[in-house]
C-alpha cells in the first residue's frame, strides 16, 4: 500500500485523483481517508497498487498512525506556497 501523507489542504487528494483518473481537481474538499486501487505494470508484470489518501487534519492522526505502521511506501506531499507544510513533513514518519 502506498500511503499519501501531508498537512491538510496541500493537495494529497488532487494528486491521488490525477494519478488514478487523469483528472485534476482544483477544489478543496477535506478527506477523511480513502483507498483507491491503481493497476500498474512493474518489470513487465501487472500489479494492483492500493493508494491510501489520508486526512491531513490533526483530529484524524490516530487513523493515520495506524496506516503509517502498515504502509509499504509513502508519498509526502507539501504545498510550495506553505513553508510550514514542508517543515511539518517530519511529523509523518
Curated annotation (Swiss-Prot):
Question: What phylogenetic lineage does the species belong to?
Answer: Eukaryota, Metazoa, Chordata, Craniata, Vertebrata
Q: Which organism is it from?
A: Limanda limanda
Instruction: Say which enzyme class the record assigns.
Output: hydrolase
- Which keywords belong to this entry? Cell membrane, GTP-binding, Hydrolase, Lipoprotein, Membrane, Nucleotide-binding, Prenylation
**Protein family (similarity comment):** Belongs to the small GTPase superfamily. Ras family.
| Pfam families with a match to the protein in the record | Ras
Show the InterPro entries listed in the entry: P-loop_NTPase (IPR027417), Small_GTP-bd (IPR005225), Small_GTPase (IPR001806), Small_GTPase_Ras-type (IPR020849)
SMART domains annotated for this entry? RAB, RAS
Q: What is the designated name of this protein?
A: Ras-like protein
Do the record's keywords include Transmembrane? no
Regulation of protein activity: Alternates between an inactive form bound to GDP and an active form bound to GTP. Activated by a guanine nucleotide-exchange factor (GEF) and inactivated by a GTPase-activating protein (GAP).
Which molecular function terms from Gene Ontology are attached? G protein activity; GTP binding
Q: Which cysteines are joined by disulfide bonds?
A: none
